[in-house]
């Protein structure tokens, strides 16, 4: 069988960045998704990014990956700021009608294991798949040769900036590596391979003024956090069933439910100081450097501090919790981590009961007498003790501070 030419394979993987799609998606994000999920969205450090762009620098944005909202928050803001950026996205996201939307938003496909193509159009792809036609297959080995050529086209001929999520998790039992969102809440290590390839492409293109921009997207509460426990478990749901429910919950149920209950949370996006592309440092060391730079940008909310200060216990006296909070705050201040939400206008630490009350409002879904929605409790407290009813969710937010506090 004759192999398809390389240009055909690259066309199947490429983005279709266009203003019409980005403008439409931006409108939906700002008037429904962001409005439904978040009470406050703050961007820090974007002015310096604009200055770098005006100076002619090529920018590679390296964020941690906590939520599906990460790329939408970033691409929406970058697009509205005139920073033309394309996104490296996993092949599992390009399904059905979402394929042209993602490509129109500047997403190009990266193949993790194997991807089968039946047509360049998603409708014909589904029809050809149903009819049993022979597909074009791109496996991991083939993609390792195509990836540098994708980047050369994007960074060279097209002149875009790049947004990459290089974080990965390793299954403790099977050893399988998973790229994408952190299901555990941990601040995942970054793949050295991504930095090896990008740096080699920059060198081949003779782009010497490129900078890696660390980005931290910190959520007071991740919109789709309740899904992650099931995604980590070996359930009977097929991949496509998980995919459909994931997107239904993340982009429809979560915004509607949080708007109805008025349980919107805060999110902060911080752009850090640019790190010049260094062609001499080892990729593993550079990946750890970028991870550390991202870690320094996080913002600590009441939820992360309280859940981490419980030390994995289900019941804890308030006195002991207050002592743990003070000890953790001391460590966070030593690392110069942003803890501003924990302090009032006069610079005083918020009372413990006030912080617990905030967490209760965000993490306890009360019963609605008008519209029956799922009811559950994560945390409760009385005069003397704090009780955890959802240890998996508490552990997820506790893990968010482990990387910086364990340094």
Regions found by a protein language model. Name each.
Residues 1-407:
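Membrane-interfacial terminal anchoring regions of lipid-handling membrane enzymes
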């Amino acid at each position: 069988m004759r192999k398809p030419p390389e240009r055909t394979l690259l066309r199947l993987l490429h983005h279709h960045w266009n203003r019409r799609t980005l403008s439409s998606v931006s409108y939906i994000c700002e008037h429904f998704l962001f409005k439904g999920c978040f009470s406050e969205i703050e961007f820090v450090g974007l002015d310096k990014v604009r200055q770098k762009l005006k100076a002619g620098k090529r920018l590679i944005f390296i964020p941690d990956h906590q939520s599906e909202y990460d790329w939408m928050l970033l691409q929406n803001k970058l697009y509205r700021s005139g920073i033309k950026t394309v996104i490296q996205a996993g092949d599992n996201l390009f399904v059905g009608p979402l394929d042209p939307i993602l490509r129109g938003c500047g997403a190009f496909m990266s193949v993790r294991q194997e991807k089968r193509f039946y047509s360049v159009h998603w409708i014909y792809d589904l029809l050809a798949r149903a009819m049993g036609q022979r597909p074009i297959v791109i496996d991991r080995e083939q993609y390792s040769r195509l990836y540098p050529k994708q980047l050369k086209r994007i960074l060279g001929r097209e002149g875009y900036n790049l947004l990459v999520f290089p974080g990965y998790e390793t299954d403790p039992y099977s050893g399988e590596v998973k790229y994408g969102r952190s299901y555990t809440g941990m601040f995942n290590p970054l793949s050295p391979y991504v930095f090896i390839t990008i740096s080699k492409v920059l060198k081949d293109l003779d782009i010497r003024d490129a900078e890696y921009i660390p980005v931290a997207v910190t959520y007071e509460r991740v919109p789709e956090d309740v899904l992650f426990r099931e995604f980590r478990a070996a359930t009977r749901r097929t991949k496509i069933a998980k995919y459909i429910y994931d997107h239904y919950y993340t982009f429809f149920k979560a915004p509607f439910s949080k708007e109805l209950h008025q349980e919107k949370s805060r999110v902060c996006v911080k752009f850090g100081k640019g790190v010049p592309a260094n062609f001499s440092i080892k990729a593993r060391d550079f990946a750890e450097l970028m991870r550390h730079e991202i870690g320094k940008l996080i913002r600590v909310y009441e939820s992360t501090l309280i859940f981490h200060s419980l030390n994995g216990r289900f019941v804890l006296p308030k006195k002991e919790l207050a002592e743990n909070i003070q000890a953790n705050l001391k460590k966070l201040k030593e690392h110069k981590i942003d803890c501003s939400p924990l302090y009032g206008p006069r610079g005083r630490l918020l009372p413990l009961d006030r912080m617990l009350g905030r967490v209760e409002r965000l993490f306890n879904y009360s019963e609605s007498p008008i519209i029956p929605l799922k009811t559950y409790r994560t945390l409760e407290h009385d005069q003397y003790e704090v009780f955890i009813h959802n240890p998996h969710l508490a552990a997820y937010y506790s893990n968010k501070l482990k990387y910086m506090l364990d340094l």
